[in-house]
């Protein structure tokens, strides 16, 4: 870290980049809500050890990869159930919140924190066509806004909540989660 800083390279430490420890996966991985709490404990250690030298932190890199790993099987752990993807998504958002709480508790005056969310905004093929506009809106709600709405608005969109309820993919959402 010191050598990076000497070379005028700003370190940005990512706490989770698709590399969940094997033993945590054996305990259910991101389907286990406790992993979010343990992530917060891990974040506390990272901030204590590196907070005075690292100016930028990212809690999670591309949380959609977790959804894809649990719902589509394209990444680890290779599961293929949408309800698993929604639960993993919710729990990784909880982990982000735990990480941010640990960061705030560490009171790091010269550092910042965030999350890396893929934003592939869908635009209607025909902006004057109501059906195209509606499709683009739904696609956005189901992709990047499924992360940004909980983080910045403190809730999932009504559309996404209704869709998860209708499809039986609603994760366990407790008071205080958002």
Please report, for each region that a protein language model flagged, where it lies by residue.
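Active-site region of glycoside hydrolase catalytic domains
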Residues: 2-178
